[in-house]
Amino acid sequence: MIRDYIAVDVETTGLNPARDRLLEIGAARILNGKVEETYQTFIDAGVEVPERITELTGITDEMRLSGKRPEQAIPEFLEFCGELPILGHNVSFDFGFLKQAAVNQGLTFEREALDTLKIARKLLPDLPSRRLPDLCAYYQVDPGNS
């Protein structure tokens, strides 16, 4: 069982990493199964937050404008990650945006990724929904601010 990893979630301006931009990165460094440190930043990539995204995430243009520029946020996040694997729910979405943002900065973002959605599909095939809030309820885990 992997006990050291980075749990990550990103918010974006849309669904396409080549066209849309990161708005927020939230992560926790898990070592020996315990949260050791967290990382959170809003990102100002110079793109207004679409109204629909504000409705979905609560992220406003004011929050974006208070954020770091990608040239600061991405290297900072990569340093936070070190060489640890990434864990997330539907992590290919997060990974695609993080990798594209790294490439845009002339950096690389290659590492193992663990997807809790794929794991849930395999282990809980009869569960009607595998959305993160539903999995938290199933396992009686407090989702916090996820």
Report residues per predicted region:
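A short, structured active-site edge motif that brings together acidic residues
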Residues: R111-R121
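Conserved non-catalytic scaffold segment of RNase H-like nuclease domains
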Residues: M1-R111, P125-N145
